[in-house]
């Protein structure tokens, strides 16, 4: 075998070649206006690290013997370590302004320009992958061939699913990223709509702000001078043109635009079918979007076992919580009624979550054909229940078809 060439297989050869080619293309695409990586906003202040000379490293990152010292000892001159932690820092540097992680929920929240939306589509992972693409740009701006090769090779390793998951996992605890449920939607008088944030106390509109920490959105455009003749006519019709009932409904729905729960009460809307009560509250629920939701009647009805904590979690952040159809003669659970209207903190959890608590913002509306029964005659309990009668039979086309058609946007319509 002496003197004969030996072909030693290098399994990483083609990956390194491809990475270097990508880095070279990225270098060619950089414009003269692009600053070096180390000079870009959000990079580290290198005064935080020991001078390279004290570590036996020159300004190219090389030593006389062995691999470049910055591969695992100190952050390189252009940015972060070539480690999973370094990638987490890259992610936060590039996208941290728009990312928060709620540990009790185990969920990322992403700023979408209007609110902090829970990540249900993998947006956090997409941003992590974009961060890896940025490593190739780091390679393009490297000060030496050694740096370029090291960065290109590391970028390939970072494309593994396990490396992406590790980047996100480490980033969850980085400063400024963790957030608790109590900090979200904390101002009960702010209402997020498509064209800004409304202060419900003053009626003023301003731009969306990250600092408000709002997670909800009402999918409508706020116009304080808008008129609603169809809505007004509908209220007149289903409430028998009674000014007292009409005024009450307007006040109650306005109250439901806020997170204020100081009235400590709920509404029971009752009456036989086709009287407009479900159309009224379902239409309003669609108008306020994320601020409204349905809850199971097991939250309110007397039963052998206490309601599951996941049912209480559905109340979090709601301003209108609708419960429907309890059946004739069903008993309301007095302790649940008091608990859910008291304004006290509520403990809850979702599946595979630890318990967490929240300040209530919901107003309960139960609509049913038959008013439920309450066993007690205690005045304190009955004071929490406001009965709203719907006595008139409304034409089906008006209550169930015409009103939604005029009030709510449908696909492919202007």
Protein language model annotation of sequence segments:
Residues 1-74:
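Glycine- and charge-rich intrinsically disordered segments
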Residues 310-317, 349-367:
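AAA+/SF3 P-loop NTPase mechanochemical coupling elements
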Residues 295-308, 335-354, 397-409, 413:
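Substrate-gripping "pore-loop 1 plus following alpha2 helix"
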Residues 50-220, 395-396:
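Intein modules and their embedded homing endonuclease domains
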Residues 319-343, 356, 374-381:
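Conserved AAA+/SF3 P-loop NTPase catalytic/coupling segment centered on the Walker-B
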Residues 99-122, 148-149, 183, 190, ...:
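P-loop NTPase catalytic core of nucleic-acid-dependent motor ATPases
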Residues 197, 327-328, 369-374, 391-395:
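Conserved nucleotide-binding/hydrolysis micro-motifs of P-loop NTPases
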Residues 358-361, 377-414:
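Phosphate-sensing "switch" segment of ASCE/P-loop ATPases
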């Amino acid at each position: 075998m002496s003197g004969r060439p030996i072909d030693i297989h290098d399994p990483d050869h083609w990956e390194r070649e491809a990475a270097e080619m990508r880095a070279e293309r990225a270098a060619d695409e950089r414009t003269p206006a692009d600053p070096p990586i180390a000079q870009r906003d959000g990079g580290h202040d290198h005064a935080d690290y020991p001078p390279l000379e004290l570590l036996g490293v020159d300004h190219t990152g090389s030593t006389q013997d062995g691999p470049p010292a910055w591969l695992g000892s100190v952050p390189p001159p252009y940015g972060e370590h070539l480690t999973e932690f370094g990638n987490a820092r890259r992610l936060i540097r590039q996208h941290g302004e728009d990312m928060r992680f709620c540990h009790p929920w185990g969920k990322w929240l992403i700023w979408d320009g209007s609110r902090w939306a829970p990540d249900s589509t993998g947006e956090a992972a997409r941003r992590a992958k974009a961060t890896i693409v940025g490593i190739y740009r780091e390679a393009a701006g490297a000060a030496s061939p050694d740096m370029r090769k090291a960065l290109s090779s590391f970028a390939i390793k970072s494309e593994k699913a396990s490396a992406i998951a590790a980047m996100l996992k480490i980033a969850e605890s980085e400063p400024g990223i963790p957030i608790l449920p109590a900090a979200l939607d904390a101002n009960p008088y702010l209402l997020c709509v498509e064209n800004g944030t409304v202060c419900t106390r003053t009626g003023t509109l301003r731009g969306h702000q990250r600092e408000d920490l709002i997670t909800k959105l009402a999918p409508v455009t706020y116009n304080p001078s808008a008129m609603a003749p169809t809505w007004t006519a509908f209220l007149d019709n289903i409430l028998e043109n009674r000014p007292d009932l009409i005024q009450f409904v307007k006040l109650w729905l306005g109250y439901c635009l806020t997170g204020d729960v100081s009235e400590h009460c709920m509404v029971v809307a009752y009456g036989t079918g086709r009287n407009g009560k479900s159309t009224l509250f379902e239409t309003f629920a669609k108008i306020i979007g994320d601020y409204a939701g349905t809850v199971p009647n097991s939250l309110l009805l007397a039963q052998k076992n206490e309601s599951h904590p996941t049912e209480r979690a559905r109340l979090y952040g709601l301003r209108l919580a609708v419960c429907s159809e309890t059946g004739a003669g069903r008993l309301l659970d007095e302790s649940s009624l008091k608990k859910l209207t008291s304004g006290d903190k509520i403990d809850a959890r979702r599946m595979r979550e630890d318990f967490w608590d929240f300040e209530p913002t919901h107003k309960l509306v139960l609509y049913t054909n038959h008013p439920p029964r309450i066993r007690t005659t205690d005045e304190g309990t009955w004071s929490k229940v406001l009965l709203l009668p719907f006595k008139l039979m409304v034409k089906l086309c008006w209550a169930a078809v015409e009103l939604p058609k005029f009030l709510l946007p449908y696909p492919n319509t202007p």
